[in-house]
């Protein structure tokens, strides 16, 4: 795991967790828009830190490492945690850590990917396909449709794929995603948590229902016209929305019935 610090050490603290196959560089266009006001911590998970010496295992293991870092370096407190896709698993476990205080948390694109009896088949097929994506830097058409993304947006993501990603790490991320919502989440009635997603991405309705069992005051925000992770391709918008959420928590909700 690699954690990079940017910005104003006197500002409020913000931690960014990346999506699958990504690393901290997924936020390289966002960080310059935040670092004048905030102290920004950008994370690369085990298996995605470019060293070839670490392996992603579980979301809980990543959360434990982050908790240790926050406890040591930030006196156990973080003002805002932003997690994209894969990062949502570690974020949920980190929010439940008894030694860590997180003021506000945003889960962006925390899709419900549990397909029941099909999970085992998916684990036999999908990690190999995504492993090829990591090394060939190419996203097939079916993957674009699945994510609700366009080719231009995906090209931006592909440039952020780090070196030395192993098949073992990719498989572990798929297992983490498929089984995340079987976790017995800690109920946190007063937690200031938001779920953000793009209008074009699916698998969100069940995710929102499940997240509300842990965070009854969950704020849901749907971004019109966006696919999975696409908000990161709009760094100015993302920066302004992060600052707004950190300031007032936000009140906007998605339209009734959205979140397929």
Task: Annotate each language-model stretch with its function.
Residues 4-52:
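Conserved HGGG/HGGXW glycine-rich cap/lid loop of the alpha/beta-hydrolase fold
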Residues 41-80, 240:
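Active-site loop/oxyanion-hole signature of alpha/beta-hydrolase fold enzymes
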Residues 82-87, 91:
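Gly/Ala-rich beta-loop-alpha elbow adjacent to hydrolase catalytic centers
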Residues 96, 100-133:
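Flexible "cap/lid" loop of the alpha/beta hydrolase fold
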Residues 117, 133-187:
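Conserved alpha/beta-hydrolase catalytic His-Asp/Glu region
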Residues 189, 195-197:
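Short beta-strand/loop motif that positions the catalytic acidic residue
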Residues 199-204, 229:
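Acidic catalytic loop of the alpha/beta-hydrolase fold
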Residues 226-237:
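Catalytic histidine-centered segment of alpha/beta-hydrolase-like enzymes
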